[in-house]
């Protein structure tokens, strides 16, 4: 599937979880709703690099020296996904949520958390699951990471949400493709079908050449 067709799966009317599932399905992932959020985040990171040729860029201000530093979160920079479950006393435990577990949760934060816990309980545990137990099974790529300041080497803690960052980057790439299509259509009077037939690399190159001559 071409990049433009893949990015057509993005729909701003959908929630972030629904967009992530739609993208993974368009990329050929079988039953993406069954993926854990941690596995899904890592696949989204790989998808982002395949589409944009880059990982997720992180920029932060160093509190020690005041300089801006940047780093790239790439598939190789994160640990592989690992199934997680924490025991809840005897007889059962709590597993990591899947995308399916996150769909159509109650709107209220307390009610939503309670329902999510209920969906992720395995077996018949001797104690009830608590909201804090979710942290023990969280393998998602959301939360603080530490990068080194490029100026003074001091560590900088940066909050990163890979799912959100990937969706924003891919939405930006979709806008770039729309611009490429517009340039080629207005310059050569080609139809959308003709432009689509060029393929992603050729469309991108021709659009760049047109932009350079303007």
Which positions does each model-derived feature cover?
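Long C-terminal interaction/binding lobes of large macromolecular proteins
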Residues: 1-214
């Amino acid at each position: 599937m071409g990049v433009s067709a893949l990015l057509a799966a993005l729909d701003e009317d959908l929630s972030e979880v629904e967009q992530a599932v739609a993208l993974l399905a368009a990329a050929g992932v079988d039953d993406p709703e069954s993926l854990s959020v941690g596995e899904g985040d890592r696949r989204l990171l790989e998808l982002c690099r395949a589409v944009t040729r880059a990982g997720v860029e992180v920029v932060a201000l160093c509190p020690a020296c005041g300089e801006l530093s940047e780093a790239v979160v790439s598939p190789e920079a994160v640990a592989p996904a690992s199934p997680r479950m924490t025991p809840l006393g005897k007889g059962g435990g709590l597993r990591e949520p899947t995308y399916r577990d996150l769909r159509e949760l109650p709107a209220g934060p307390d009610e939503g958390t309670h329902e999510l816990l209920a969906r992720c309980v395995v077996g018949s545990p001797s104690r009830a699951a608590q909201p804090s137990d979710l942290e023990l099974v969280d393998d998602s790529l959301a939360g603080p990471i530490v990068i080194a300041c490029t100026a003074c080497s001091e560590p900088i803690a940066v909050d990163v949400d890979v799912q959100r960052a990937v969706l924003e980057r891919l939405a930006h790439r979709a806008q770039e493709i729309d611009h490429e299509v517009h340039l080629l259509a207005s310059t050569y009077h080609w139809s959308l079908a003709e432009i689509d037939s060029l393929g992603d690399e050729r469309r991108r190159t021709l659009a760049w050449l047109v932009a350079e001559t303007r």
